[in-house]
């Protein structure tokens, strides 16, 4: 949590913790209606959604939800017709959020990898990690840069202070599970 904002990550990954193929695109095997419905409900509750430029351009904002697009081409923080555009190398997160979501609230973080990495460092309050248990994506894009042989997304979430609160199967036929990770209470 930073100020009045709570950071909630959302992703669906393959069994080998990939969010995209080598081409950077989300493969059809990671598209699931049960996960999509939960994700859309989370977006409806969000004060702002923070995502990368590629994701913003690939996913039209048909519902005109409030977006903060992370891009190294933005000059600090810019209000453009389609969204807030933010370069974290020039403007810090709290300053960007004061403008993009001045009343605080939930900041939904759906990626891509650079955005997931940034908020892993900031600190997630919660992370909904759906997993397609029967899907692998050799040479795909891992959810976090530090995912490597012997280091899973779950390992990284634990290292950054989260614990798996509950895991449930959200689509039995497709073997999709969802783990809700939450920030550990500080004694």
Sequence positions of predicted segments:
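Enzymes that bind and transform nitrogen-containing heteroaromatic metabolites
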Residues: 1-187
